[in-house]
Amino acid sequence: MASGEDDLIARYFRPLATDPGALGLVDDAAVLTSSGDDLVVTTDAVVEGVHFLPGDPPDTIARKALRVNLSDLAAKGAVPAGFVLTLALREAKEAWLAPFARALGEDAAAFNCPVLGGDTVSTPGPLMISITAF
């Protein structure tokens, strides 16, 4: 998604980047300010055909992808600070990305866990979403 990656990020995910550490999602990395407390980090991937079915609604997939990570943080007694998102997509389709991004943004706001960075790539394989939360 080399040339279209910037457009995809600008349209669907930059509006979700509400934390200053996201730096407007112009890079794959985020800047975090440490408070001196321990930082709990977790990562989970969800893969089409393994963790969800090809016809599952994109909003449901988005919520699952984020919530499995938030559950891991909660299990450690951690308060979420943000997450980075990796999407491996066969195609960048509006009909799929719009509800995915909307649901991801709703959950990110509800759990005070903003997107801070990430990556998008194209793949001939199944859809894969990976989130690293902290």
Where are these regions (language model features)?
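Extreme N-terminal cap/leader segments of soluble proteins
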Residues: M1-T60, K76, L85, D107, ...
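Alpha-helical scaffold segments in soluble metabolic enzymes
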Residues: D7-R11, V68, D72, A103
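Glycine-rich anion/phosphate-binding loops
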Residues: G21-L23, L53-V68, A92-R102
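Short Gly/Ser/Thr- and Asp/Glu-enriched loop/turn motifs at secondary-structure junctions
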Residues: L25-D27, N69, P80, P126
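Glycine-rich anion-binding loops of enzyme active sites
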Residues: T33-L39, V46, V79-F134
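A short, N-terminal amphipathic alpha-helix
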Residues: A65-K76, A108
